[in-house]
A protein has these predicted regions:
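Mature N-terminal segment immediately following signal peptide/propeptide cleavage
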Residues: 42-58
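Short loop/turn microsegments at loop-to-beta-strand junctions
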Residues: 44, 82, 261-262, 325-328
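Surface-exposed recognition segments
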Residues: 21-36, 42, 67-74, 94-197, ...
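Bacterial Sec-dependent N-terminal signal peptides
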Residues: 1-30, 37, 274
Length: 423
């Protein structure tokens, strides 16, 4: 028996050593066993925006005389971008995931898996029974509104309980020479965010205006599933991006595939570059200079005249695929909802940002002045006049504000030089 064991071990060692020899043969050939990488990667619902250069800044008259977007030639690295704004139903997937993950943790038992290092993870194979008479009902009771807070006696989940914690790394702080020997944990930031959209923003945004049906139905009713999500803060949009990264990379890891970079909000100039669709000095995503086509039809969802909202076909928001896309295949880069960007708003930022992937950010703290909490929004919305639809127009909102006219879309950095290298 021992002899057979020795023969087996010797055979294994010979095969292993011969494999090493045939794999490298004393030559520099690169490390083996690298993860798989799909050269033709194209995330679902996104379009590829190639690297390029363009002149940012006004393509038409600066009617506000704000002078906060002077002309500047810049270069942008390639990236993927959502072809539409994130819709109610897409954001609802995030809400449901958070709700289910909290429920799994509260139920415990077979709903949790324990790793070799003692850490716990969720067993997503276990179903959750939300019925009132289920075995799980007692453990889940604290997720619901109290009886005094229930409307018509309906037992609804309290959206204030739906919190998601995400983290990010402060790369620029870590790059400072004086921080070279500091522990990695110094640069890891975490934030817990209540992720349910603020449905009351429809009432808050417009005084002496009847918008209660939108508050009751816009996010919850299937009629609006394909409409852009609104009422989300800048932090909520970032939390969504962090969850989306985790969701896809976890799946890729299970399949032995290399991870992708992080989904995130677009940098202001990435957004403008994509909105122009490769056109030069075009004031609108479709070119311009007019807001109507040759038949007199409006080309976006906005406020075309005083007291006139529905002429373009939409009283409020419209479906995320309404109107024609631009030359990159991106829908509603003008109108419908304005969109959050990653960029901090400073009036003079065009004067000092780099000409290669220009970027300026500021991680505002609660105690900071409100002016430091401004984030750039782009594209204009259903309630804005035509000026705000221009590809070069800059505007802003406070990062903790929720508006019925502000949504977002995600981008994903392209890894490599060009998509054409892989064809």
């Amino acid at each position: 028996m021992n002899r057979l064991r020795l023969v087996a071990i010797a055979t294994f060692l010979i095969a292993y050593l011969s494999g090493c020899k045939s794999g490298y043969d004393g030559q520099l050939v690169g490390a083996a066993d690298r993860p798989q990488w799909d050269n033709n990667l194209l995330p679902y619902g996104m379009v590829y925006v190639p690297s390029g250069t363009f002149t940012t800044g006004p393509s038409d008259q600066d009617i506000n005389y704000s002078f906060n977007a002077k002309a500047k030639a810049i270069s942008i690295n390639g990236f993927y971008m959502d072809e539409t704004e994130v819709t109610n139903n897409e954001y609802r997937q995030f809400v449901y995931w958070v709700k289910d993950s909290i429920a799994h943790m509260m139920i415990g038992g077979d709903h949790l898996l324990e790793g070799e290092d003692g850490t716990q993870s969720i067993n997503w194979e276990m179903p959750i029974d939300w019925s009132a008479n289920s075995e799980d009902a007692g453990a889940l009771e604290s997720m619901y509104y109290s009886e005094a807070d229930r409307l018509y006696g309906v037992k609804d989940v309290d959206p204030r309980k739906l919190e998601y914690e995400f983290s990010w790394f402060l790369w620029r702080d870590a790059a400072l020479r004086e921080n070279f020997n500091k522990p990695r944990s110094t640069f890891i930031k975490k934030k817990k965010v209540a992720i349910y959209p603020d449905t009351l923003c429809w009432i808050r945004d417009f005084t002496y205006s009847y918008n209660e049906p939108m508050t009751r139905s816009y996010f919850s009713h299937p009629a609006y599933d394909d409409y852009p999500v609104v009422g989300v803060t800048w932090d909520q949009a970032n939390a969504f991006c962090g969850w989306r990264t985790r969701l896809w990379n976890d799946n890729r890891s299970k399949n032995g595939e290399a991870p992708v970079d992080e989904f995130r909000l677009p940098i202001e100039h990435e957004w403008e570059y994509a909105a122009r669709g490769g056109r030069i000095a075009s004031p609108y995503p479709w070119g311009g200079p007019y807001l109507r086509n040759t038949k007199g039809c409006l080309l976006a969802n906005f406020k075309p005249g005083r007291g006139n909202y529905p002429e373009d076909g939409g009283f409020y928001t419209v479906k995320s695929t309404a109107y024609w896309p631009n030359d990159y295949g991106l829908y509603n880069m003008a109108g419908n909802v304005a969109e959050w960007t990653l960029t901090a708003f400073f009036e003079n930022s065009y004067s000092f940002v780099h000409d290669k992937n220009p970027d300026i950010r500021y991680d505002a703290k609660d105690e900071d002045p409100t002016t430091l909490k401004r984030k750039v929004i782009r594209g204009g919305s259903w309630k804005d006049v035509g000026y705000f639809l221009q590809t070069s127009t800059r505007s802003w909102e406070y990062q903790d504000s929720t508006k019925s006219y502000v949504g977002f879309r995600c981008v994903l950095p392209f890894l490599g030089r060009s998509m054409s290298d892989f064809n």
